[in-house]
Amino acid sequence: MKSALVWFKTDLRIQDNETLVKAISKSDQVIPVYCIDESHFTTTSYGFQKTGSFRAQFLLEALQDLDEQLRTLGSGLLLVKGKPEVEIPKLVKAYRIQKVYAKREVAFEELATEKKVQTALFKLGCDFETCSTSTLYHAEDLPFSIKDIPEVFTNFRKKTEKDAEIRAPFAAPTRISSPEIPSLVLPDLAELGLEKPITDSRAVLPFVGGERAAIQRLKHYLFDTQLLSTYKETRNGMVGADYSSKFSPWLGLGCISPRYIYAEVQRYEAQFGANDSTYWLVFELLWRDYFRFMFKKHKTKYFLYEGIKTEKVLSKSLNEKLLSQWINGTTNSDFINANMIELKQTGFMSNRGRQNVASYFCNELQQDWRIGAAYFEQQLIDYDVSSNWGNWAYLAGVGNDPRGHRYFNIEKQAADYDKNKAFRKLWLE
């Protein structure tokens, strides 16, 4: 009897999940597994938690949702905690697994873990296969090799849109043959070394983890309200649930896939018509792809102070007082303060806000951009390694910005995007 293990990571869904579909089609029985990686709940070299309370809570909700969905298909989620390179091989031995399926990684730490697991499995004579589950386009479908991907997004976008095709999403399985999977017992946040986040009524949305919540949000934003048709005009908003799609927390944990969203956008366009706004949502998904492919190309460079630039630069020394003012929203700028308080209290911030607080941190406060990126890694409910570090490098002038150092005039930005001070009043009064 052929037994396979599906190692879930940031692909916590049953829709459009190639690892799951492949394992089911090529095996007699499948064991879905999630390993709570203890290294994800440590403190980084910058002094921040690798995973903060907001994202950890969202993750636990997503795991609960995945388990419930798997149970309806005749399976369940087997949860282990520790080092994946220790825990996955243990399960391979216990369940006599011949093959492990997992999503393909691109970032340095994730790749290192993947390699360790692969090495341990090789010693056991167990096969290991990875699938691309996080992008709109498959790397092998791009009109260039990874090493030849253009360093400017516009060049990448134009050629990709012209010469590559987005594959159709995989349908969700209807049945999974599994041995009996023990009931899911999730740790609480205290066991992960975290405090329970306090709910703030001013938050843009009460984000709930899991695929079903993701699909519900997509249905709301597209078919229930047709807000997608005005996305391009409203996406720079800062107050309320619906100025933007807010899909990012679910995309970050893979509760929904870019290809699934794309297919739904196409269905929406067939029903309500295509326009600049419907295109713009896909355009933003392409940015996510771009940063992911850039990570594949440049490997560890996005974690260096000089980023992907060739000239060496001396990193700036940390000013603890300025960092504390930035984190706690007590700087000289009320616009920056409002954004940083929103992030601290809710784990979320608008795209417009993120660009401004990053520019302020790098240019006005003259701090090492990586410290800001590391704080975002802790705090964001929608943290995605490639998007976070890629965007921070971009705004610090050491990433993929063709214009070099990008400087935001914070006062002008506040006047343009928070004209009546509604956002500042919400968070500062």
Where are these regions (language model features)?
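Short conserved catalytic/interaction loops centered on acidic-Pro-aromatic/His motifs
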Residues: 112, 130, 165, 366-378, ...
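Short alpha-helical scaffolding segments that buttress acidic/His motifs in well-ordered protein cores
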Residues: 247-251, 281-294, 339-343, 357-361, ...
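C-terminal, helix-dominated tail/subdomain
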Residues: 310-315, 364, 375-429
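Helix-loop-helix junctions that connect adjacent transmembrane helices in secondary transporters/permeases
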Residues: 300-330
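Glycine/tryptophan-enriched, flexible segments
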Residues: 147-309, 414-429
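Trp/Phe/Arg-rich N-terminal binding region typifying the photolyase-homology
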Residues: 1-168, 341-342, 387
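Short acidic alpha-helical/loop segments enriched in Asp/Glu that coordinate divalent cations
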Residues: 296-308, 354, 368-375, 388-391
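C-terminal substrate/ligand-recognition segments
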Residues: 292, 297, 321-367
